[in-house]
Amino acid sequence: MKPDILLEICCGSAEDAIEAARGGADRVELNNNLFQGGLTPSIGTLEVVKAEIDIPVMAMVRPRAGGFCYTETELATARADAKALIRKGADGLVFGFLHADGTVDTERTRAFVELAEGRPCVFHRALDVVPDWKRALDELISAGVTRVLTSGQQSNVFFALETIREMIAFAGNAIEILPGAGITLENVDRVVRETGCSQVHLARHRILTDTSVANNREIYYGGCLYPPEDRIEITDREYVSAVRSRLGGSER
């Protein structure tokens, strides 16, 4: 395994990001609500993370769950969030904008690249639903996007290794390809070997218990799935460290 494979960890809280950095992550993607694919983190979360870790923090800008064709109100929210995140020290932005037909909204994409003020910009897995990924990559390159996060238009990277390899070859040095979704300690070697990627994106959590809700097990604060309210997910530092070792490098 090459020692220069960059490890990015997908994080849903300040605790996640701190544990990821301690485990040896090279970069974190900071979100809120990973259950819904990751939404915009709070400014307070970003401030705490920036005060505690010294690796790049890419901040998600996603005002709601679901698709990526936003109303003007949602776009205004995303714009305000992006400006605040940059002002508070985000090292880059992660976003995705599509038209109703699933093609890249280049105008909105370019506008958010400008909001980043020269910092790296990532077009996230919205790429995985575009009808023509080659055309989409060309448009993202033209818009000034630094990197794309992709599962190769499959539910799991492992089912799209050849496509991701094709994406990397097509992109050349014009835009970075970051594989993510379904990468594990057990398959990361093969993902790197068969795609030729130089970086990987993954998440892994362990479960903590919050006993403050133990007095009444009939109460739920979320929607219809009714998850146990005493369970908290946090980045598994030891797992991150194991992946870092597998890729080459050591725990921080």
For the regions a language model picked out, list residue spans one by one.
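N-terminal amphipathic alpha-helix/helix-capping segment at the start of soluble metabolic enzymes
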Residues: 1-10, 50-51, 216, 252
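N-terminal pre-domain/capping segments
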Residues: 2-28, 33-40
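Hydrophobic faces of well-ordered beta-strands that scaffold small-molecule active sites
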Residues: 5-11, 28-30, 57-61, 93-95, ...
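Catalytic cores of alpha/beta
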Residues: 12-22, 69-81, 128-143, 167, ...
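Active-site-adjacent beta->alpha loops and helix N-cap segments on the catalytic face
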Residues: 15, 34-55, 73-75, 97-117, ...
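Glycine-enriched alpha-helix->loop->beta-strand junction motifs that scaffold or abut catalytic
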Residues: 22-28, 53-56, 89-92, 115-119, ...
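Structural motif corresponding to the early beta-alpha repeats
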Residues: 47-86, 96
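C-terminal alpha-helical cap/extension of soluble enzyme domains
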Residues: 65, 172-252
